[in-house]
């Protein structure tokens, strides 16, 4: 293990001791963050509590589909991570348990609001602003300036040079559409998306695929959460990031307890641990740079400071509603996805 991971293990163990979280048993978790983050949490929690952790990695859209599929007989106890909109949809559909953590006052306001908006059926665990990633070598080779705004992405020099995900499968891409609708108004947002379409080479299934393509030199620009760009830069790839000057949205990565899951008490113990400062160090240990929701977690300088960028007043309750999500995605599929380039 790296030194950071060892320190994280020690901090998490002390947290577990102070919270009296030692217990045998089992907890079944769907994890919608990066694989190493999931694995670190699973390993440390299992070692220090004796609890058997069954961890399955799924994207947020797939996770919501699984919870719906098994709602008559839930197999899952906890859903950790992924964009907050699907968690709000799960809450709306009665798939998750109302649970008000005593640690809520320690969390940032945006994490508390996520809990309140869901009637305490989910909670925010991290914040990640939306922006652009770009390959610095490709920009230099093509004598292009890095995009600084949503408007810049429409420039003809970026024709076929942009990748973004498909909002039907990606929370990242849905966050982009919802952000543009709130920033521009719905009609102008869809005019923008149609104008952007010729510049998009492909709509990927995964929200992280575009920035990985930019890192490998397969595309010049990605629409991504900026923390995913930072991860690629830390791993040595020639990428940079920016948040658009007109304003942008952010994901509130969330955590939910599944209603009528097989191990509800074990789920509550894990949930409480995952909200502690010790439990929130695993993202950074896995080279992930979202802002943790617990205010007592030291902020790494590589994390984007929300106070230093132009964030819109994103309406998570409205755009996290199932009907609104379905409507906007259906409109995008009809008007944008299959339009001529």
Predicted regions and their residues:
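Early extracytoplasmic/lumenal segment of secretory-pathway proteins
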Residues: 24-89
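Extracytoplasmic ligand-binding site segments that recognize negatively charged/polar headgroups
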Residues: 33-39, 75-218
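A ligand-binding cleft/hinge motif common to bilobed small-molecule-binding domains
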Residues: 85-89, 215, 220-238
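Short beta-strand->loop
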Residues: 97-106, 122, 151, 237-249, ...
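A bilobed periplasmic-binding-protein/Venus flytrap-type ligand-binding module shared by bacterial periplasmic
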Residues: 133-138, 178, 252-264, 282-283
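Periplasmic-binding protein-like
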Residues: 192-197, 203-204, 235-259, 295
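Mature extracytoplasmic/periplasmic domains
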Residues: 258-316
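Conserved C-terminal helix/tail region of periplasmic/extracytoplasmic solute-binding proteins
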Residues: 315-341
């Amino acid at each position: 293990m790296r030194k950071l991971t060892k320190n994280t293990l020690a901090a998490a163990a002390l947290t577990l001791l102070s919270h009296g979280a030692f217990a045998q048993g089992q907890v079944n978790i769907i994890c919608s963050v990066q694989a190493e983050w999931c694995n670190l949490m699973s390993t440390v929690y299992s070692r220090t509590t004796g609890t058997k952790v069954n961890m399955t990695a799924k994207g947020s859209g797939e996770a919501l589909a699984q919870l719906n599929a098994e709602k008559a007989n839930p197999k899952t106890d906890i859903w950790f991570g992924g964009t907050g909109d699907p968690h709000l949809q799960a809450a709306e559909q009665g798939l998750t348990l109302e649970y008000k953590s005593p640690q809520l006052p320690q969390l940032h306001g945006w994490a508390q609001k996520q809990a309140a908006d869901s009637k305490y059926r989910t909670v925010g665990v991290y914040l990640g602003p939306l922006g652009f990633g770009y390959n610095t070598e490709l920009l230099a080779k093509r004598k292009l300036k890095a995009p600084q705004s949503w408007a810049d992405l429409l420039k003809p020099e970026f024709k076929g040079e942009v990748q973004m995900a498909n909002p039907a499968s990606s929370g990242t891409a849905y966050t982009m559409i919802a952000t543009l609708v709130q920033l521009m108004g719905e009609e102008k947002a869809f005019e923008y998306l149609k104008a952007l379409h010729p510049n998009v080479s492909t709509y990927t299934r995964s929200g992280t695929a575009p920035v990985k393509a930019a890192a490998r030199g397969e595309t010049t620009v990605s629409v991504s959460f900026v923390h995913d760009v930072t991860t690629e830069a830390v791993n040595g790839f020639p990428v940079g990031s920016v948040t658009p000057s007109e304003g942008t949205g952010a994901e509130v990565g969330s955590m939910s307890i599944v209603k009528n899951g097989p191990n509800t008490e074990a789920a509550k113990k894990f949930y409480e641990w995952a909200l502690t400062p010790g439990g929130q160090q695993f993202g950074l240990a896995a080279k992930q740079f979202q802002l943790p929701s617990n205010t007592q977690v030291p902020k790494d300088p590589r994390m984007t400071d929300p106070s230093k960028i132009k964030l819109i007043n994103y309406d998570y309750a409205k755009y996290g509603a199932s009907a609104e999500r379905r409507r906007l995605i259906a409109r995008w599929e009809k008007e944008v996805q299959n339009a001529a380039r």
